[in-house]
């Protein structure tokens, strides 16, 4: 009987306060998170940002109990999914591979090899594809595969995105309906979908399908909710968790909350649409920061739809995904890891790869830029990184 | 039905080459591993040693495939033990808590709390108690419990050591017998028990029962082997993995190997007695370094008994331990974490706690000592740390 390994990929999160800095360093070291023209600056900048940013971030993790629950929840999801698949007669074992914290992808690959798995199904726990989430995880897995002959022998099938999965849509709709029904005036409640943002350039220049998938997904969910309840609620879709000076997908959730308050919304249901597990973005950013903004702007009843975690209908949807992936056409790791098109970094000036004039000019500019930033931050204790909200 | 959580404690090991340095830092930051008179020097010294030692250590991990298999094996042991306990009608879930690397004890505690466990059995995967292994893990768990009210509510029972466990002794004996039978002259083969060493002062000054338990354990195993085979093999017991300038338990394994070769031993069976999982000490130190010493000294047939890993008889022995712990008298975490007596650090001079003359004198001495070491190592690129084998 084929031994199937289901590799669940997610972001990872620090579980102890002292791990926050190293976690941030890993995150900002990824060129898919902060893009720089010369890779040589990646690690120093990652070190610099993570060092200066970690105390703020530590406070956020302190506020949710001292660490991220993501590993625990993801491992629970893995166990539940494994049981669901075995109940269907699929001899599956599930593994967890985090991108920026333990357990890392390397550990999962070692486990898969040791367990004599015949076929691997790669399932990112991001319903919507983005260069910076599923894309980064697929490419990490491909890097490990390139240098591991034993791993290369294994057949791999990938699930690239699954925002339209029936179980996922239905479980999101169910949880939203429960919150609507708990409102004083259910049909006057406003639904605020909030997704993790990405830089606008990812979508507009690099062709990241993320925004389209998020929009389609919100429509599918709202349609399901309306059909079930028999009435329509007003809704908005916005993006949260912006970092850095670049423009990200708009509207920003915090601005939408202010507008909704100003427009007289009294009962609000916030739906974290791109997160399937409770994490810092739901427990701290939405439940604490955004709630405060909402209440300050006149919203009285602030309700947040819980993340799916191990909601049985959702786990069943994941099992459907794995089952159809096994019987459907194979999507290779190369196809899944492929970027939509060449990412244009600086469209205003032609960029050339290699050690050439263009590179040297940019090298000088970036070095001066980073030097000035460091100078201000270190000497004056304030500067551009504080100004743009990175510190 | 009582939900039992079985907490398996072990050392932990880096799974990726880049994790070797941080792992060593964690290891040497533990005052149970390197004892200093003033805790303030602990972290700088840990940083210094781990930084300078990591490239040598990385090479060792490279030689065994790029990382430690300890997490993977320990999680396999956890799964097998869980199944064995459930087959006996005990509603058990097992958890892994590593002391110096991921998954850390904090993660296991979070999982235990989330799973609504009623009773925790703490089982160190060290058969023999030592201040620096089980002792350090018990105290780590106690520190976490002291600051966690939810965790304090949980009933905890500890297994302090289990070197005389029937399943453990029997499975060690079985594996040794297999190796003896594979020798050309089975009754002429020499058995070399090798245990992880500890500083002699732990045993002689602090009262660590480690050496006694190792000796008793070797006798139990050899007795079982003799009864089963019907003949006696010569055997020795020695200690490996010494680090630093201090005297450790003797004889040292490398010296014993030289002597055995000089005495004409041709077939040798090395038995890693204090390790229940394959790790750097078995796969690299014994299989590569000690094998080389043995072959260079005239030993022809060098055989190493495999670590127990998930050997069914061994897992069954662990299940016996958990079952009797649940029905037997309760050993609390405080009792398990207790040191045998106050550790005497510098018996040649009376040590007084607090900021007093004695502390200041030692402060000055240690600061000068560390400064001189750093100076030699950094400026000349060679010095005392190289000389004593730390680098």
UniProtKB/Swiss-Prot annotation, chains A, B:
The keyword DNA damage does not apply. It comes from Prochlorococcus marinus (strain SARG / CCMP1375 / SS120). It holds the Pfam family Ferrochelatase. One of its GO terms (cellular component) is cytoplasm. It is found in: Cytoplasm. The gene is hemH. GO terms for molecular function: ferrochelatase activity; metal ion binding. This is Ferrochelatase. Coiled coil: none annotated.
């Amino acid at each position: 009987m084929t031994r199937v390994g289901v590799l669940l990929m997610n972001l990872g999160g620090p579980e102890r306060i002292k791990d926050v800095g190293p976690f941030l360093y890993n995150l900002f070291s990824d060129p898919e998170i902060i893009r720089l023209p010369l890779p040589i600056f990646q690690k120093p900048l990652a070190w610099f940002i993570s060092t200066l940013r970690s105390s703020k971030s530590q406070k956020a993790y302190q506020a949710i109990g001292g660490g991220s629950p993501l590993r625990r929840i993801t491992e629970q999801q893995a166990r539940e999914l494994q049981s669901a698949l075995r109940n269907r007669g699929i001899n599956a074992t599930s593994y967890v591979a985090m991108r920026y914290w333990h357990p890392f992808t390397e550990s999962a690959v070692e486990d898969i090899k040791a367990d004599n798995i015949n076929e691997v199904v790669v399932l990112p726990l991001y319903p919507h594809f983005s260069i910076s989430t599923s894309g980064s995880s697929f490419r990490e897995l491909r890097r490990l595969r390139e240098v591991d002959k034993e791993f290369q022998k294994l057949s791999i099938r990938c699930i690239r995105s699954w925002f339209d999965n029936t179980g996922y849509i239905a479980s999101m709709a169910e949880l939203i309906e429960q919150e609507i029904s708990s409102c004083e005036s259910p049909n006057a409640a406003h639904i605020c979908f909030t997704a993790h943002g990405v830089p606008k350039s990812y979508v507009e220049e690099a062709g990241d399908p993320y925004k389209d998938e998020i929009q389609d997904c919100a429509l599918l969910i709202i349609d399901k909710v309306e059909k079930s309840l028999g009435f329509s609620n007003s809704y908005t879709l916005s993006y949260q968790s912006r970092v850095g000076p670049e423009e990200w997908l708009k509207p920003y959730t915090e601005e939408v909350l202010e507008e909704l308050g100003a427009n007289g919304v009294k009962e609000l249901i916030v739906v974290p649409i791109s997160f399937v597990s409770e994490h810092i973005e739901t427990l701290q950013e939405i439940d604490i920061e955004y709630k405060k903004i909402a209440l300050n702007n006149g919203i009285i009843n602030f309700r947040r739809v819980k993340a799916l975690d191990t909601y049985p209908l959702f786990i069943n949807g994941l099992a459907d995904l794995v089952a159809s992936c096994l019987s459907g056409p194979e999507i290779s790791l190369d196809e899944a890891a492929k970027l939509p098109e060449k990412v244009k970094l600086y469209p205003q000036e032609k960029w050339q790869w290699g050690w050439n004039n263009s590179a040297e000019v940019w090298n000088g500019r970036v070095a001066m830029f980073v030097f000035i930033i460091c100078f201000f931050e270190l000497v004056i204790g304030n500067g551009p990184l504080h100004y743009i909200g990175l510190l």
